[in-house]
Amino acid sequence: MSSRSPDELLRIEGIRKTFPGVVALDSVDFDLRRGEVHVLLGENGAGKSTLIKMLSGAYTPDAGRILAGGEEVRIHGAQDSERLGIATIYQEFNLVPDLTVAENIFLGRQPRRLGMIDRKRMDADAEVLLKRVGVNVSPRARVRELGIARLQMVEIAKALSLDARVLIMDEPTAVLTSEEVDKLFAIVRRLREDGVGIVFITHHLEEIAALGDRVTVIRDGRSVGQVPASTPEDELVRLMVGRSIEQQYPRERTDAGEALLKVEGLTRDGVFHDVGFEVRAGEVVGIAGLVGAGRTEVVRAVFGADPYDAGTVHVAGAPLRRHDVNAAMAAGIGLVPEDRKGQGLVLDASVEENLGLVTLRSTARAGLVDLKGQHTAAERIAGQLGVRMAGLGQHVRTLSGGNQQKVVIGKWLLANTKVLILDEPTRGIDVGAKVEIYQLINELTAAGAAVLMISSDLPEVLGMSDRVVVMAQGRVAGELTAEQATQDAVMALAVSTHTGNSPHSGGTDGTEASRGH
C-alpha cells in the first residue's frame, strides 16, 4: 500500500483471520484518512463484517497488524476500540429500548454530581449531540418510541459522545426511505467536514459516487483493489465478483408447457378483486405494481397462508383447497417469503435442519425421521446451490444474506416443487449473489417448474420475466409479454385510471413506483 499520509487515522496491513474450516480474511490491507468517506465494498460473505469486528474489538487478527495514528495497536475489546476513537454502528442497533435517548447515549458514562447521576447535564449534553446530527428528538424520549431513522441518528450521536475520530457504518441505508437516506448523507458529509474518518459499507453502487471518496473492494476474504469513488459501476462490479457481468439479468427462456398454476376470479373483500393469471411450466411470470397494489396479499392467498372470499386456484389442473398451506405444499407450491429471516428460516437451526423443513414429514419412515437420507439430500442441494458455509451444521443466522436465500430456495428444491413463488427474491443481496439466484431460477424453469415472482426492483421484473402481470388497487391492470414489457408500459398500466383484465387497462395508486406490494 502507499506510504503513510499525515492525515491517516487508521491502517490495516496484511490482516488474516480464520475460523474452523473457513479463511475469513487473508492479507487484507485498508487505510482511512481524516475527513474522508472510505467505502468498503464486497459481496455478502466477502469478509467485510469480519474486518469491522476486528476494528471494534469483537475479533482479534491471527496475523497482520492494525495501526492508529501511525502506531501499532492491539484491540482486544470494545473499550480498546473506544479509547482509540473508533465507533461502530451495526445494522442491528446496540440500544436499550426501555432507556431514554440520553441514557443510551451516555450508557456507562453518565455525568455525576455528588455521587448521583446528573440528569440535567446528561440531557443537555445529549441535546447538543442530537442537534449536531440534525435530529429533532427529545433526550428524554424512550428509545422504543423511535423509528429506524431516528434510532440510527441516536447511534451516531452516541458515537460522537465518545469523541470518535473513526466512524464505521455497516449498511446504514438498508432500511431507510429515500428521504431518510438524503438526511443521513447530509450528516455524513457534515461529519466528514469536521474531520471524522468514515468507513461506509454499502451494497448500493449508486451511493458510492454520491458519498464516497475512495473504495476498497474485498473479494473472498482478500482486498483486491483500491479505486476512486468515481470508478464506473461496471468496473466496481467486476472487482467485486471477479468477473464481468455482461448481462445483469441472465434469463434463459424455454418453451412454455402446460399451465401449472391457474388463478381465476380471486377475491378478498377490501384487499384484492377478481384476480386472474396463469403460470406455465418453464415460465417466469413477474407481478409488478405500486405500493398497496395487493401483490403479496394475492400470492399469500394462493399459497393458503391467507384466506380469500371467492375464486379458484388450480395446480396442474387440479383444484386447490383454499386457506390450507399443507394442501398447497402437497400440490407442489412453494413460497419464498419477503421476510426470509422472520418467515422463511429458523435462524438458530443449522443449514441441514432448514433445508429439511419442508420434506421432514414426507421422508419419514414408520413415523421416524430418516436422518441419513435427510443429510445426503441436504448435502446434495447445498452443493448444487453453492451455499458458502463451514458445513451443514453451521447455524443459518451466521450465513450471509445471499446464502440464507439459497437455503430458503433449497428447501423447496428438495421438495420437488412444481410452482415456486418468490416474493422479493434478491432484496438485501449483493449484485454477485443476485446473479446466482437468477441462475437458480433458470435451472428451475429448465427443469419444468413454474416461477411466479414479485419484486420491488422493476428492472429485475422486466429482465427475468417471460410475462409481466401488472396490478393496481388489488386488481389485474393488464398483462405484457417480455417484448411488450418496458418500464414505461408497466408504469402506464400501474397508474392508469380504469381497472380490469384487458391487456391495456389499469388502476390508480398514488404511491412510489415499483417499490412495495
From Swiss-Prot:
Its EC number is 7.5.2.7. It catalyses: D-ribose(out) + ATP + H2O = D-ribose(in) + ADP + phosphate + H(+). One of its GO terms (cellular component) is plasma membrane. Gene3D superfamilies: P-loop containing nucleotide triphosphate hydrolases. The keyword Membrane applies. The keyword Kinase does not apply. Residues 497-517 are annotated as: Disordered. InterPro entries: AAA+_ATPase, ABC_carbohydrate_import_ATPase, ABC_transporter-like_ATP-bd, ABC_transporter-like_CS, P-loop_NTPase. Keywords: ATP-binding, Cell membrane, Membrane, Nucleotide-binding, Repeat, Sugar transport, Translocase, Transport. Residues 10-245, 255-498 form the ABC transporter domain. It is found in: Cell membrane. One of its GO terms (molecular function) is ATP hydrolysis activity. ATP binds at G42, E43, N44, G45, A46, G47, K48, S49. Signal peptide: none annotated. The complex is composed of an ATP-binding protein (RbsA), two transmembrane proteins (RbsC) and a solute-binding protein (RbsB). This is Ribose import ATP-binding protein RbsA 2. It comes from Streptomyces coelicolor (strain ATCC BAA-471 / A3(2) / M145). The lineage of its organism: Bacteria, Bacillati, Actinomycetota, Actinomycetes, Kitasatosporales.
